[in-house]
Amino acid sequence: MIMSRFSYDVAVAYRIYPKMSVGRPPIFGEDKFKLAELCLKSFKDSLGGLRVKLWALLNDCPPAYESIFTKLWAPEDLVLLRYPGVGAGITLQEQTRILTEQTDAEIVHFAEDDYFYLPGQFHLAVDFLKQNPAADFATPYDHPDQHTTDLHNLFHETRAFGGKTWSSCISTTHTFLAKRAALIESRKLFLKLFQDFEGRTSPDLAMWMALTKKRVFNPVKFFRWSLSHRYWAGSIFLAWYHCWPQILFGRRFTLWAPQPSIATHMVAKLQAPGIDWQKEFQARMAAAGKI
């Protein structure tokens, strides 16, 4: 029997902030603490039997936020890190540093505080990465725009795994899983972008375009989108401006997304398709004794 040299299945760096994001959530729209508590509990329930070490990056958080983590994680599996209201770029740099330097797990997870996970399903993303040598990154989130917009209207490689269809994709948010080796290989790109946008959230679409090398070699789309979809065109520009060495000389990394989704972004207009999320929210709250 071959023993793993890793003591955990997943290493997680979880960013949490006590203020609401720009998009209104589908539940607890006026109470970030309750929203964060629900999301973290859903993440814990999604892990099942996975062995997880978690770093909680508490950015300007009152003490009550720490208690959410200490109630759910054993002290030996939890590291609490406190930041005095720094920009998103700083905590993204910290996530990158933590997850590349740790040697506890070969699969790592960049987590944000506004994602809700389905119970017992997170292992599917972990197993998908472990069992697919060509997969570098994975998102637990089936983005609704993957199915409806011109940006994502291109060939996708698909693989059936764990009762889901996994598709290669262009981009995701700052919530994603990675093989530690792939993250180490792309570390310079991550840190450069996060440093360049230190006080703000870095441009995730531009970052993923540079890594996956999708949509960055199509000048026709660039000029067309410059008129109709400036965010897409602007992301292509930012990818070239900040990440041109990766685009020209780096290898093409792969990013995969599941359908149906494993998690959803807690923005009312951006929920993953095909799942009754309100039903899932109510079920999680009932299980936790919240209703």
Where do the protein language model's features map onto the residues?
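Short beta-strand-to-loop acidic/aromatic patch adjacent to the donor-nucleotide binding site
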Residues: A105-F116
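C-terminal catalytic/acceptor-binding lobe
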Residues: R5-S7, R180-A181, E185-I291
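Conserved catalytic core of nucleotide-sugar-dependent glycosyltransferases
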Residues: F116-L193
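Phosphate/oxyanion-binding active-site loops and adjacent basic polyanion-contact surfaces
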Residues: F28-C39, P84-L92, Y117, T172, ...
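Short loop->beta transition adjacent to catalytic acidic/histidine clusters or analogous donor-positioning motifs
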Residues: V10, S46-W55, L78-V79, E106
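Active-site-proximal specificity loops/subdomain of glycosyltransferases
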Residues: P62-E106
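N-proximal low-complexity "stem/linker" segments adjacent to membrane-targeting elements
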Residues: M1-D45
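Short loop/turn segments at strand-loop or loop-helix junctions that form parts
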Residues: V10-S21, N59-D60, P140-H143, P258-I262
